Regions:
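Boundary at the C-terminal end of the N-terminal hydrophobic targeting segment
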Residues: 31-34
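N-terminal secretory signal peptides that target proteins for export/translocation
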Residues: 1-11
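Short, internal strand/loop/helix patches
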Residues: 95-97, 110-148
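Thiol-/selenol-based redox modules, centered on thioredoxin-like
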Residues: 141, 150-187
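A short beta-strand-turn-helix
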Residues: 40-60
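Bacterial N-terminal signal peptides
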Residues: 13-26
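Short active-site neighborhood of thiol/selenol oxidoreductases, capturing the structured segment around
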Residues: 55-75
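Structural microenvironment flanking redox-active thiols in thiol-disulfide oxidoreductases
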Residues: 71-122
Length: 187
């Protein structure tokens, strides 16, 4: 059995080893393996229409994909870090993308968007929320996302739709560091 001298790693060295291991597991090896963001027409909660991914406003865009209202807490765990990233790099924008089945119907979709608009007092936040009414299976397939809707996904996407990085679940410093490294690599 191979024995590694990890007991000799202290403080910063141990963190660096852990960071490298986590980055290797969080970052995709290629955009093809990570998927391509599909062509979608959708509106934000300020009722501005977008043709995605080409009308994402950043050269690089962080999209937080959620499937259930109960996942908002997971989304919220990311927001302070995403605001810091956006403030520090003018080429990066972030969006919240609630993904809802297109079979929901026009009236229910209108009710859902209206409820979200009423529940979000900040105009800036409403502008960042773009509700996607899509074929969920086709959407997940295009992005190579698991079929499960038990967690959120955080993607770094360019305007051509290439997924450059992927993370999932609640915010962690290690996953955020991996995201920042992917942004730096793709500037």
């Amino acid at each position: 059995m191979l024995k590694l001298p990890f007991h000799r790693l202290t403080g910063g060295k141990a963190f660096l080893v852990l960071l490298v291991v986590c980055m290797a597991t969080a970052m995709p090896f290629s955009a093809q393996a990570a998927g391509i963001f599909p062509q979608i027409t959708a509106a934000n909660l300020e009722q501005r229409n977008y043709r995605l991914p080409e009308e994402f406003e950043g050269r690089l865009n962080i999209v937080v994909i959620a499937y259930k209202r109960e996942q908002q807490e997971l989304v919220n765990s990311w927001l302070p870090a995403l605001r810091r990233i956006e403030r520090s790099d003018m080429s990066v924008r972030f969006y919240e993308l609630p993904v809802i089945s297109r079979l929901t119907g026009f009236f229910m979709g209108w009710m859902i968007d209206r409820g979200m608009r009423r529940g979000i007092p900040s105009k800036d936040t409403r502008a960042r929320v773009i509700t996607l009414y899509v074929d969920k299976d086709a959407f997940k397939t295009a992005l190579n996302l698991p079929r499960s809707e038990d967690t959120i996904y955080v993607l770094l996407v360019d305007r051509r739709g290439r997924v450059l990085w992927r993370g999932e679940g609640t915010y962690s410093n290690i996953t955020a560091a991996s995201l920042r490294a992917a942004i730096a690599q793709n500037r």
